[in-house]
Swiss-Prot record:
Classification via Gene3D superfamilies: 3.40.50.2020
Assigned EC number: 2.4.2.10
Subunit structure as annotated in this protein's UniProt entry: Homodimer.
Protein name according to UniProt: Orotate phosphoribosyltransferase
Example of a GO MF term: orotate phosphoribosyltransferase activity
Species the sequence originates in: Erythrobacter litoralis (strain HTCC2594)
Main enzyme class: transferase
Gene name as annotated: pyrE
Classification via InterPro entries: OPRT, Orotate_PRibTrfase_bac, PRibTrfase_dom, PRTase-like
Pathway in which the depicted protein is active: Pyrimidine metabolism; UMP biosynthesis via de novo pathway; UMP from orotate: step 1/2
Family matches, as CDD domains: PRTases_typeI
Annotated binding of orotate, by residue: T121, R149
Keywords: Glycosyltransferase, Magnesium, Pyrimidine biosynthesis, Transferase
Cofactor: Mg(2+)
Amino acid sequence: MTDEEVLSEFRASEALLEGHFMLSSGRHSGHYLQCARVLMNPERAGRLAMALAQKLPRELRGEIDVVVSPAMGGLIIGHEMGRALGKDAIFLERPDGEFHLRRGFRLEPGAKVLMVEDVVTTGLSSREAIEAVKREGGEVVAEVSLVDRSAGEADLGVPYYALVEINFPTFANGEVPEGLARIPVTKPGSRAK
């Protein structure tokens, strides 16, 4: 799947939003990718997951024991990656602000884990999720996401593969351009309060 084909899937599902958004990373942006919309169609979600699975080197695909994704954003694409790879897919939750496995999910000691996210911007959530997998006894061997918004700068400490790289400018508090600052802020991400 080419970058343009991926973006076409986002446009077709009205998943590319414009406005003033506070991202989960705490940074501001004039654009937001609502991956839940692009993944709401099971056929589209399956196509995207198959294309994402093909980004992984063959030897790495053979190494994976289980797919883990952080709730909420990673749930659907994580499940579809499990299907694409023929592996179980489980997820992490933040009941107290820190990621944990719940609902009877567990990892076998030393399990080789593929971490799956919808979007990576700074990599903070990914690093927290990877740390949670370590606490649970697993080893993250790679991470994948539908979208890399980090401009290739996210250091996750593991090999990282994205289906597409999209570089919308983001701004720290106090650095938001005047035109963007005039638009009311929406907090659509997983850390929205």
